[in-house]
Amino acid sequence: MKKILFLVLSASLLYSCADVSGALFAGGDGTYDFKNVHLDPKYQVDESKIHLLDLLSGEEDTIYALYVGDFAQIATDTIIVFLHGNTPSMDSYWQTAGLFSNLVEKHHYGFIMYDYRGFGWSTGRSTGAASMAADYDAVLSFLQAQGLTSDRMVVVANSLGSLPAGPAAAGGSSIPVQKLIMEVPQSTSNVIMQNATGLSLPASMITSYKFDLGQNMEDYAGELLWMHGTEDAVAPLETAEAAMQKHQGTYYQEAIYEGAGHGLRWDIGDEEWSKVVLDFIRH
């Protein structure tokens, strides 16, 4: 009887999770209230440099992106392209935007982040590798039209952001990735699925979203910084390590922090986090 009940529950779970967005992704509403009042005073920005963009992704979806900086800066300065983690919208990363916008000095670097389909105000649903690649491409097309080149682009992927960042770094980016920061990356769909369902089922049983971050890193020829905590229960260190250490590119750096969890920057502090990131950008 227990076995039959388990099979029934499993079948129900498989059916309900056939849509990847329901199983893997935590997309939701966003307010997009990007103002200094919500920032730590030391990370406040020039509010005239806050730009909310709507970009066409694929044939019919619209994704929303936040650019902080002067548009003219894109053609001359280093731009941070931030791929956020598994939260309802990029609202959760406004403080991160402020931090990046104040590295070195206020607006030394341009900064852009965006919501994947189904996150925040972005339309549609994130359904797999193709939809996430299309969203990334939409942002890169905008930056490329503004004059961004590969030698001035730094891609920063937080947690779930490793899903689009990996294939992009491995050759799927219209602006080739030369510098990549992987912060607490999700490295296998199995781990993400287990976190979402609480069951140790292979992701292939539930979703067609398969990704191989290890292969992506093996194929990535540029510079890589990997940052992780030893106590990360969301993106386990061991699985991330196996993927990251396949990198054989021009430069590899890892920063592993004892006792830190998935909220790495909060655990180690902004000063240490910023130092490691800035040193890598300047390398």
Each model region followed by its residue ranges:
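Conserved alpha/beta-hydrolase
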Residues: V104-T123
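An N-terminal hydrophobic leader/cap segment in hydrolases
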Residues: S16-L56, V68
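Hydrolase active-site cap/lid region
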Residues: P164-N216
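Short alpha-helix in the alpha/beta-hydrolase fold that links the catalytic acid
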Residues: Q95-T96, L213, G222, P236-K246
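The serine-hydrolase catalytic nucleophile loop
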Residues: P88-F100, R125
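Short beta-strand/loop motif that positions the catalytic acidic residue
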Residues: Y220-A221, L225-D232
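Alpha/beta-hydrolase active-site loop
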Residues: S126-G147
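C-terminal catalytic histidine-bearing segment of alpha/beta-hydrolase fold enzymes
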Residues: G249-H283
